[in-house]
Amino acid sequence: LHARSSLAPERAFYFLKTVKESPVPFAEWSAYTVSFHESESVEVMQFILRILRDLLLLRVGVSIEKIQLKRYASELSAIVLQWPEDEIQQGIKAVEEGLEGVSRYVNIHLIWDYICLTFLQGRGLY
C-alpha cells in the first residue's frame, strides 16, 4: 500500500461524521476534498462503501466478529445507531454510482457533490 492509502479510513470516517453532524456539511466536505487526487478520492469512496456495508450488517443484527472492518469495530459501534438502514442503503447506492462515474471519466468533484448531496437528503437537509 502506498502512503495515501493509510489516510482513506480516516477520511472515510470524517466524511460520515461531516455529512451527519456538520452545520455546513456540503461546504465543509467540498473544501476538504478540493486537493484530493482522483486516486485518493476513489480510495476514500471504496472505504466509505466498506464502512457502510459493515454498518448495514450491524444494523440487521450481525455480530461484530463477522464484519469486514474488525480493526474499526469501536468506531463502527460508536456510529451505528446514527445510521438508519435506509440511509445506509441510499449511501451505498450513491457511492457505487460515484465509483461507476469515475470509471466513465466524470469529474471527481461532481461525483463528490452527488454523493454528498445524496447523504444530505437522507439527513433531511436537501
Regions of interest found by a model, annotated:
Residues 1-47, 51-126:
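Charged, glycine-rich active-site and insertion segments that engage polyanionic ligands
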